[in-house]
Amino acid sequence: MLQSNEYFSGKVKSIGFTSSSTGRASVGVMAEGEYTFGTAEPEEMTVVSGALKVLLPGTVEWKVYAAGEVFNVPGHSEFHLQVAEPTSYLCRYL
């Protein structure tokens, strides 16, 4: 079953799903902007196209992740994103 989600007044949209190869996950697109997300459980984020500038919990420096790159976010935390162009991603819930 697919579950559609919309955040930040429609600037971030995702579709949640479960599959044997990825487990529970969502795939989505972020429009240009700055966003803060909270996590309930650990997440693995893969940038599919575009790039995300990320400030992870416990860090003080922003890091850019380009298409094909992966970063992990601890559970029960929040992370900040800056998006300069429409960017797609895959989020796996670990």
From Swiss-Prot:
EC number(s) given by UniProt: 2.4.2.1, 2.4.2.2
GO cellular component term of the entry, any: cytosol
Record-linked CDD domains: cupin_PpnP-like
Reactions accelerated catalytically: a purine D-ribonucleoside + phosphate = a purine nucleobase + alpha-D-ribose 1-phosphate; adenosine + phosphate = alpha-D-ribose 1-phosphate + adenine; cytidine + phosphate = cytosine + alpha-D-ribose 1-phosphate; guanosine + phosphate = alpha-D-ribose 1-phosphate + guanine
InterPro entries the record matches: Ppnp, RmlC-like_jellyroll, RmlC_Cupin_sf
A Pfam family recorded for this sequence: Ppnp
Key words, A-Z: Glycosyltransferase, Transferase
Gene3D superfamilies: Jelly Rolls
Enzyme class: transferase
GO molecular function: guanosine phosphorylase activity; purine-nucleoside phosphorylase activity; thymidine phosphorylase activity; uridine phosphorylase activity
Function: Catalyzes the phosphorolysis of diverse nucleosides, yielding D-ribose 1-phosphate and the respective free bases. Can use uridine, adenosine, guanosine, cytidine, thymidine, inosine and xanthosine as substrates. Also catalyzes the reverse reactions.
PANTHER family tied to this protein: PYRIMIDINE/PURINE NUCLEOSIDE PHOSPHORYLASE (PTHR36540), PYRIMIDINE_PURINE NUCLEOSIDE PHOSPHORYLASE (PTHR36540:SF1)
Similarity section: Belongs to the nucleoside phosphorylase PpnP family.
Protein name as annotated: Pyrimidine/purine nucleoside phosphorylase
Organism field: Salmonella heidelberg (strain SL476)
